[in-house]
Amino acid sequence: MKLSYAICFSVVTLILLISVGMTQQIRYDMPFKTTFNNLSPQAKAEVECLAENIYFESAYEPKQGQIAVAFVTLNRVNSGLFETDICGVVKQKIKNVCQFSWYCEDKPYRISTEKRLTSTPNSLYNDIRDLAVSVYINYERMIDPSNGALFYHADYVNPGWKNMKMTAVVGRHIFYNRTGKGI
């Protein structure tokens, strides 16, 4: 009797562990799929800005880290605290400081070169742009790996932010949200 109880308990525990583990997976190949070429001109422009931000902020991070960076960008769009479109958020300066450091480092002018260098069908930039399309069209149906973050930084810098609550660590990025008012 004790043995069958222990086996039953172990099976239930295993099922619970598996189900908990499965909820932690982040899907980026959501059921609503389209290609970049099928988007409207306005959506293409927004996706390009999102892809550039993912590329320059997290190109060599795990896929979940790239998705988390995309979510911070889209969380800002929907927060009411930043610009109301993706390109505006990516290019926004607050107190003459770029919100995404790559944008102030002349990289926007290099992106066309980056695209040309990576024009093969399986290039890193094209993979990231496909990811950006997927997140763009499925944002409201996806799990946010940043847990609602509006800010992040790489783990090798210390910005000294105050009034920030850490929401997640994904790859080499640490994600935060505000605890008070203002940005």
Language model: regions and residue ranges:
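Positively charged n-region of N-terminal signal peptides that target proteins for export
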Residues: M1-Y5
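Hydrophobic membrane-insertion alpha-helices, especially the h-region
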Residues: A6-G21
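Bacterial extracytoplasmic/cell-wall-associated proteins, especially those involved in peptidoglycan
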Residues: G21-I183
